[in-house]
Each structure stands twice: as structure tokens, then as C-alpha cells.
Amino acid sequence: DPEMSRGLGDVYKRQMKRIAIAALSAVILQGVTPLDSLNVYASENTGASYTALDLYTYIQDQCSTEYTLTEKAETFLEEHDDLFPASTELVIPDEMIDAELDFRHINKNPSRYGDKLMRISDAYVIQVQEEEIEEGHYLTWLNLIDGEEQQYSVYYNGELDDVFEDDTVEVTGLPLGTSSFENTEGGDTLVVVLAGCRVNNID
């Protein structure tokens, strides 16, 4: 019954929202300034004056969910600049995606990962923000929670015109590391940080 499915979907979203708000204080991009200091290698993929590796190296200690790039992630970003972001025409080979990889693996030992992409299905968008980091080039940040109530911080090198707060998305991205932030209850919320490769609104 489509009506019942829609109703259950709304209940699920409200539940996710409640969990997220209970655990989360406002998190925003902080101090991300134009990347004037980088301009070393232009990206053929985006036309920006910085590559994906430049970007994710630069923002790791400039963003609200600070992280430390793993060596494997650095290598992957350098070798696959065309995936960040991936155009709609680009087919991502199955062997580049670890279908078994999830939050638990990365949280346990981030340094073991970053040489393959991961996919998060049915992730709920808690927050989404966009920041201009070079004239005409934007960074989009998404704070997501999945069905297991695990949270992700996704930095997407570009604009996501059809993705908004309260939407449900499927994300393909590269695990860069882990981070945490203080939640409203005084504890720490752990997040896995991803470089967004592709983000699809599935609502």
C-alpha cells in the first residue's frame, strides 16, 4: 500500500530527526576561506585551481568536524581526482566500492581504509550547508544519520542543488578519517568523515 509506505516513511524521518536533535548541537563550516594559498595544480575535473587532494588536505583542520587524512585516502584522492565529484556520466567501477564497509570498521581503525569508496543508502539529511571557497566553486557539507543511528560528515566538492534538510540521500564517498563534536548532552558524538563522490536525493 503506497499510502501506508509513505506514512511509515514519515514516521521514520521524524524518529531520525528526534534522535539527531537530541544528540546534536549546531555544527557549521568554520573558517573555510578562499583557497588562495593552494593554487598549485588546477583540477581538470572541476576547473577549479585546486585538486581534490588539495581541498581535503586543506579543510581537514579548517572545518567543524576536523579529521586527519589517512595515507590511503591521500593516495586515492591523488589518483582519482575525477571522482570528486563524479559526473553523472561517469560509471564508478564496482571494484572501487567496498560494499561491506560501514561506520563500525572505520571507527575501529581509520588508517586501514581510504583505498576504496563506501556507499551509504537511505541516509537522512540533518543539516546541509554550502560555502563558496573560490569564485564560482562551492563546498557542500552534509550532516547525515543512517538507519543504524550512525552519523557521517560529508564534504562534497561542488553544489547539490536538489538536496535539502530532511531529505533522504544515497551517498558514495571516500572515508577520510573520523571526527567528533560535543553534543547537547555534554558527551561526544563520533562521526565518519567522507569526501563526497556522488550524492543522490532518493525522496
Model-identified regions with their sequence ranges:
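Single conserved hydrophobic/aromatic residue that forms the stacking wall/gate
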Residues: D1-Q15
